[in-house]
Amino acid sequence: MPATFEFECKNLNIIPIKECNELYNKCKVGICMSASNPSRIPFEMMSAGLPVVELYKENNIYDLPDEGVLLAQPIPEAIASAIAYILDNPQVAEKMSKFGVQYMKNYPLEKGFEEYLKAVKDMLETDYKDIPEIKPLYKKSAFLATEEAMKCSEELQKAQPIYVDNHGKTYRFLRRCKRVLKNILIKMGIKKQ
């Protein structure tokens, strides 16, 4: 059964690599929000030459190079700031794009599998004494929210409610928007259920 969403989108399911690359090449910035475990999607995006914004979480700092991605503090304002920074700085986007393509030429999918298998083998066959410390690949600090993004967020929170007929199309649309935003904030750990 295909996934359903409360907002307009087109679920492409699994698409061939060529189509995936074409899709990424229609974008200016790739956004991935891996909050608990590493994702392969930022690597796909870098391979396609797409600058990437990801969350600054421990599960990402060991895998992702700081020249190809911006790891943002996991709050909406910082994520928006990182996206805006890339969009407002074409030279940064170009540099990230070129780095990502070059980096991924030396990082085939098999390399990731080999590294994973070696790590599992080391864990099973040793007493952990001779395993070298793994250092984060991403050495920058988290990309923080700009003052502009924080002010915008504050203004949005102060905004007066819009009153509409509670039986109309606009009301139903606004209710759906509110549910979607609430679910996003809950999933990001910003709002409690």
Regions found by a protein language model. Give the residues of each.
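Acidic donor-binding loop of glycosyltransferase active sites
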Residues: 22-37, 50
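C-terminal amphipathic helix plus adjacent low-complexity
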Residues: 92-193
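Conserved catalytic-core segment of nucleotide-activated headgroup transferases in glycan assembly
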Residues: 1-17
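Short hydrophobic beta-strand element within catalytic cores of glycosyltransferases
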Residues: 51-57
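Residue-level signal for the nucleotide or nucleotide-sugar donor/cofactor binding architecture
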Residues: 40, 74, 107
